[in-house]
A protein has these predicted regions:
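Karyopherin-beta/Importin-beta family HEAT-repeat alpha-solenoid scaffold
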Residues: 1-520
Length: 520
């Protein structure tokens, strides 16, 4: 600290001292003790004259000084002056991604700071700085940077704090989304709106502007505009925003549901980009999962430009692309929606045929390079069969993973002399000593943060009627898989082959799928 304050010390020496302070402070928070306020004040005064990597280093050091517990002696005034200086640095260096990222880390730490009043003060000051920058009249790059920072602070701020800024944050966000063209800014703001809908739904949906226009009407205008824009706007952020709004608005959407469904399916019919397609399918699947009867009836009665019903168009695209969904939460929603669709099957879907299993190549044909590059040929099967295939496939996959987890748990609990070791030295297929081991470590670390204790597992499964808890269930992902497997098994057991469309669906299953269904 003395080196940093020395007027005749060289710049490299001062930077080395700052880096040492940062490293020590991150490792031992009590290192500087009562000097924290003085050091923070000194570093804060350096922010306006620092640039590039030097500014990043200073920001990282300031972040290390932010209190992590209530024993800190730092006053709210010191943290306020630091926040002001940081926000001023953002305004001057928003074009530098590294500086922008460091500033977001500091603001997130301030939002978690236990000093009384610091989180609320940080959120208010941040929104006062970012909200005016959401404009089409500002310099290029200002709006997307402000939108990204708003998303960052919204993600960390708790619901109580967000309620206090809805009245001036929502108008700024909505105003830009109704006229802005920057894709990056729009995607960040869609995520911000999704966070507001999840954390403070009553405040966001109960807001009215000066003309007494309800926020829901403004949100619907935003959705309408986004659906009319390029497909790259309608990515994952758009899907999360839609589902968050659908989940919180509920029956408030009933008057506009016909127009909303028509707009979503019309966009889906024209979509060519995978992100846009999967996003629209996810939003429609959510509505199908929670409002199946109304959604099926409305889509069946809606005719698109080509004369085809919206229900047929939606189901055709859905069954073709649903397997590309990789997120567990989204996959759960799709499986629930497919079960609901099967239970509300309509005559308009009886004559819909889609791609089934891949047809084998003829034995008598020589496989040339051009034939090898040709598209695979698929068996055409009824749509009802494809739905049943997807549900059986998901059940079989989940059941296999649960059985493997149970087997590992049983072996781990067995006495050492009874544990299987015959394959201790056997080679494993497709293992790369660099990539695969690192990926396995990454997966382990990812799951460790989601571990549940035995009581929580039992409680979560008992809530859905599962009394017999399988062994080896330790993570939230495992619990979700058990729930999904249980629901799929109940649904598949309830099928009655005497119902015409059910009988037709079962008749086109292959031998493996029929065996799986019979085992239930």
């Amino acid at each position: 600290v003395d080196v940093v304050r020395m007027p005749d010390a060289s710049l490299p020496l001062k930077l080395s001292a700052v880096r040492a302070i940062c490293n020590i402070k991150m490792d031992r928070a009590e290192a500087t003790g009562s000097d924290d306020a003085a050091v923070l004040e000194h570093f804060t005064t350096l922010l306006p004259v620092a640039t590039h990597s030097t500014l990043v280093l200073l920001l990282d050091t300031l972040e290390a000084f932010i209190p992590r517990d209530k024993s800190s002696s730092l006053s709210l005034d010191v943290l306020q002056r630091m926040t002001e200086a940081i926000l001023l640095s953002w305004r001057h260096h928003m074009s530098d991604p590294a500086i922008e990222l460091s500033i977001s880390y500091v603001l997130e730490s301030l939002l978690k700071c236990p000093v009384p009043g610091c989180p609320a003060q940080t959120l208010y000051m941040s929104m006062q700085a970012f909200a005016p920058c959401l404009s089409v009249d500002v310099e290029l790059g200002v709006a997307p940077s402000a939108a990204a920072m708003i998303r960052s602070v919204f993600r960390v701020a708790d619901a109580e704090m967000l309620r206090d800024v809805v009245s001036f944050a929502f108008p700024a966000v909505a105003s830009y989304m109704l006229v802005g063209e920057d894709v990056e800014a729009l995607q960040s703001l869609m995520q911000s709106l999704a966070i507001l809908c999840e954390k403070c739904p009553h405040d966001i949906l109960g807001w009215h502007d000066e003309h007494d226009t309800p926020s829901l009407q403004i949100l619907l205008r935003i959705i309408e505009r986004l659906l009319c824009m390029d497909e790259q706007v309608c990515g994952q952020a758009f899907g999360k925003f839609l589902v968050a709004l659908f989940a919180q608005a509920g029956s408030m959407l009933a008057p506009v549901m016909p127009a909303l469904l028509h707009a979503l399916v019309a966009k889906l019919a024209q979509a060519t980009m995978p992100d846009c397609t999967l996003t629209l399918l996810y939003a429609l699947a959510y509505l199908m999962a929670h409002h199946a009867e109304a959604v099926v009836a409305q889509l069946a009665a809606t005719e698109l430009e080509g004369g085809e019903s919206a229900l047929v168009t939606f189901v055709r695209r859905w069954l073709a692309d649903v397997l590309y969904t990789t997120t567990p939460d989204m996959l759960q929603e799709h499986m629930t929606a497919l079960m609901q669709l099967f239970q509300h099957w309509t005559p308009s879907l009886q004559h819909l045929f889609v791609d089934g299993d891949v047809l084998p190549a003829p034995d008598h044909v020589i496989m040339t390079r051009s034939r090898a590059k040709a598209y695979q040929q698929y068996e055409q099967i009824p749509a009802s069969t494809k739905v049943l295939k997807l549900l059986l496939q998901e059940y079989a996959t989940s059941r296999k993973l649960l059985d493997e987890a149970h087997a590992r748990d049983v072996q781990a609990k067995a006495p050492l002399e009874e544990q299987l070791d015959h394959d201790e030295w056997s080679d494993e297929d497709d293992v790369d000593l660099g990539l695969d081991i690192n990926w396995a470590d990454f997966q382990d670390e990812e799951e460790e943060g989601d571990v549940m204790d035995e009581a929580d597992v039992r409680e979560a499964l008992r809530a859905v009627g599962i009394a017999d808890v399988p062994s080896g269930i330790r993570t939230r992902r495992d619990v979700d898989r058990v729930r999904r497997t249980h629901c799929l098994a109940q649904f598949l057991r309830s099928l009655d082959a005497r119902v015409p469309y059910v009988g037709e669906a079962v008749s086109h299953l292959n031998a493996t799928e029929r065996a799986c269904l019979s085992s239930l």
